[in-house]
């Protein structure tokens, strides 16, 4: 087991921060046509990222000084496809949430072999391991049964998009999850369906897929961190691979993070999760990740 100490100087994460998304990898074992991560540009399974090794992630993440109540959220892609995820979970000193589709390689035995599950033990108004069901890609009954096996020692639940095309399927999932004693929640569908726009957007014209304003000031309370350790201003920058606009790298000894307005020339290519009105990490409604000033 590696030491949780780091040789890098500490980095204070601004108090206003609501979320740190750690993209261990952009690889995924599913191929969903509706993947929100490929909203404007292909991000999933694009071979353009060097992935940090487990030892690098441990060094980088342990230097962070997080605001009270804010965990690290491992995501992707599929975070369990990173070969070092089990080593990371054993050695990172912070609480950790995981967004996963629960690939077949993730088993009860692998979790039981971990030297600690302390990373999973935090007070939270929602499951800290959030398993997503992807319609057309896997069997929700088998997924629920696997989650049920993990529930005795993990804070874990099932999530699915509340898509208007198949409310009957969502109700079936809800009933089966309740029958099996598994927590099931839906997430708001983002986008347009049969001429109707779903979700509430603070900036309704922000997600059209092309820049429509070249001089806005944007401040984000979310830090998306790419597989190579680069910290991006927003999800649009990450998915668009705008490395030249990154705020820095987690392994940079001189890294400093500031919560401030920054110039942006890409308004109109925003990702819905950054501009929608939603709940914050305390599940308080009315929060939006970004605040944008227009000239």
Enumerate the predicted regions with their spans.
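Ankyrin repeat (ANK) tandem alpha-helical domains that serve as protein-protein interaction scaffolds
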Residues: 43, 52-63, 87, 175, ...
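Residues immediately within or flanking Cys/His clusters that coordinate Zn2+
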Residues: 25, 29, 215, 267
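Generic structural signal for well-ordered alpha-helices
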Residues: 58-61, 86-89, 108-115, 143-148, ...
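Core AdoMet radical
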Residues: 19, 39-52, 67-82, 93-109, ...
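Radical SAM enzyme [4Fe-4S]-AdoMet core and its adjacent flexible, acidic
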Residues: 128-248, 252-255
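Flexible mid-to-C-terminal extensions adjoining Fe-S/redox cofactors in radical SAM and related proteins
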Residues: 1-18, 38, 237-295
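Canonical Radical SAM [4Fe-4S] cluster-binding loop centered on the CxxxCxxC motif
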Residues: 8-56, 67, 235, 241, ...
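Short catalytic/ligand-binding loop motif for oxyanion handling, primarily in non-cytosolic enzymes
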Residues: 31, 41-44, 81-83, 106-107, ...
């Amino acid at each position: 087991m590696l030491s949780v100490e780091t040789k890098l100087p500490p980095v204070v994460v601004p108090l206003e921060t609501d979320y740190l998304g750690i993209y261990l990898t952009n690889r995924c074992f599913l191929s969903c046509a509706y993947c929100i991560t490929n909203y404007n540009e292909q991000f999933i399974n694009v071979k353009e990222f060097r992935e940090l090794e487990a030892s690098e992630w441990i060094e980088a993440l342990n230097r962070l000084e997080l605001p009270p109540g804010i965990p690290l959220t491992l995501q992707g892609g599929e975070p369990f496809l990173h070969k070092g995820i089990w080593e990371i979970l054993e050695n990172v000193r912070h609480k950790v949430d995981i967004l996963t589709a629960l690939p077949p390689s993730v088993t009860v035995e692998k979790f039981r072999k971990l030297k600690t599950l302390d990373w999973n033990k935090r007070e939270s108004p929602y499951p800290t391991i959030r398993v997503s069901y992807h319609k057309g890609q896997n069997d929700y009954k088998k997924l629920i049964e696997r989650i049920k096996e993990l529930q005795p020692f993990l804070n874990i639940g099932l999530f699915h998009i509340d898509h208007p095309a198949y409310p009957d399927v969502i109700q079936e999932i809800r009933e089966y999850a309740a029958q099996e004693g598994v927590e099931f929640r839906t997430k708001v569908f983002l986008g347009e369906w049969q001429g109707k726009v779903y979700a509430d957007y603070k900036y309704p014209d922000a997600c059209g897929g092309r820049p429509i304003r070249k001089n806005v000031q944007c401040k984000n309370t979310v830090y998306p961190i790419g597989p190579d350790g680069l910290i991006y201003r927003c999800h649009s920058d990450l998915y668009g691979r705008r490395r030249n606009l990154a705020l820095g790298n987690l392994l940079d000894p001189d890294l400093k993070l500031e919560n401030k307005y920054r110039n942006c020339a890409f308004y109109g290519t925003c990702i819905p999760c950054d501009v929608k009105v939603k709940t914050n990490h305390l599940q308080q409604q009315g929060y939006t990740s970004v605040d944008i000033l227009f000239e």
